[in-house]
């Protein structure tokens, strides 16, 4: 059944009333585009069965910075995630982040598994490992070496591109660009 509506807690209640609780809820490359994440989390919590899981895939901000994936940063993406804030966000909504898989999609993403608080799954070691790495990188500090280096590498890319375009113009060549 396809429901032509935006997902929220009210829709989740209707789904549960008609079909029962869900053992699996998925969302791929959408979570970062949602304005009201709290409402989505409330809906997911209402929809999940006691042993159910919510699996979503989204950009991983650490990979974005380390891999220079700034071309994916644009207006549709309202959030860029790291693991610690995700853990706190789901805890606030009575859920727990129990597993994370790093995947190469879109320059570096994470596939996260969330369950209701106290659910049957044990927390995978990778969750704590990624949180420890984020803390070591000082990802929450805009003046951390990670971001200073990121800024420097972006400026270097700008210099290289500007130089290349000047060289091409000097050779009488024309350049064209297109973007979405």
What do the PLM-derived regions correspond to, one by one?
Residues 56-79, 83-85:
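Short, glycine-/aromatic-enriched active-site segment of Class I SAM-dependent methyltransferases
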Residues 30:
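Hydrophobic adenine-recognition pocket in adenosine-nucleotide-binding enzymes
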Residues 106-153:
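Flexible, glycine-/basic-rich loop-and-beta segments that form/coincide
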Residues 1-14:
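Conserved SAM-binding strand-loop segment of SAM-dependent methyltransferases
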Residues 38-55:
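A short glycine-rich, Lys/Arg-flanked "PGG" loop and its adjoining helix->strand segment in the class I
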Residues 95-106:
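Conserved S-adenosyl-L-methionine
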Residues 23-26:
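A conserved beta-strand element that flanks and buttresses the S-adenosyl-L-methionine
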Residues 153-171:
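A short, well-structured juxtamembrane/interface segment
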């Amino acid at each position: 059944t396809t429901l032509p509506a935006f997902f929220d807690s009210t829709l989740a209640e209707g789904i549960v009333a008609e079909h029962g609780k869900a053992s699996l809820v998925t969302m791929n490359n959408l979570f970062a585009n949602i304005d009201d994440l709290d409402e989505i989390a409330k809906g997911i919590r209402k929809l999940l069965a006691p042993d159910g899981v919510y699996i979503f895939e989204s950009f991983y901000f650490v990979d974005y910075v380390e891999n220079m994936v700034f071309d994916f940063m644009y207006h549709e993406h309202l959030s860029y995630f790291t693991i610690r804030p995700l853990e706190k966000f789901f805890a606030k909504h009575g859920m727990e982040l129990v597993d994370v898989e790093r995947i190469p999609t879109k320059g570096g993403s994470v596939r996260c598994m969330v369950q209701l608080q106290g659910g049957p799954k044990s927390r995978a070691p990778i969750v704590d490992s990624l949180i420890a790495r984020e803390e070591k990188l000082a990802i929450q500090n805009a003046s951390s070496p990670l971001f200073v280096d990121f800024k420097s590498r972006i400026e270097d890319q700008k210099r290289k591109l500007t130089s290349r375009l000047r060289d091409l113009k000097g050779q009488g060549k024309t350049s064209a660009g297109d973007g979405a």
